[in-house]
Amino acid sequence: MTRTVAVLVGSLRSQSINHTVAKALAKVAEGRLVFDFVEIGDLPLYNDDLWHDGRGPEPVERMRAQIAAADGVLLVTPEYNRTVPGVLVNALDWGSRPWGQSVWVNKPAGCCGAATGAIGTAAAQLALKAQMVTLGMVVMGHPEFYLKFDPEKFAEDGTVTDESLRGFLKTYTDALAAHIERLC
């Protein structure tokens, strides 16, 4: 059965390497997972005063509906100053409120990321995974995904040109699909 994954990328940059990686994962997962990319750049900074009658601003309600409708979640994070970008934390905050109405609870989830440095996004992912567990997501622990990004391994359309990398992405998406299937 094909499952839907809400994908949140923690970078707003138009040429984001993490968007490139997320699109490559989507291509590799075709037929097993459908990636529904969630726009988080238009979310206001979290402010409890913006809730009215249990509803948040329109971008918040759109994001929450996408996540609620998905079978699982994939957070694709860059690493800023050895931690998670504020835009991604902001999305997590909006999704966890109002109290008792979190869209994250019991959601099968994965976490991955890419950077140009040798350790990929290891520090950010450690922080993010702790937050994901705190929010009640059921986080896939293995395989881990810390990618040192090499632009020469991707075509302009996002297709992975390196066979070894394509295999790694397939292993990851196979594991994510199995994780979601077990929990749905």
Language model features with spans:
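N-terminal beta-loop-helix "entrance" segment that forms/cooperates
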Residues: 40-57, 154
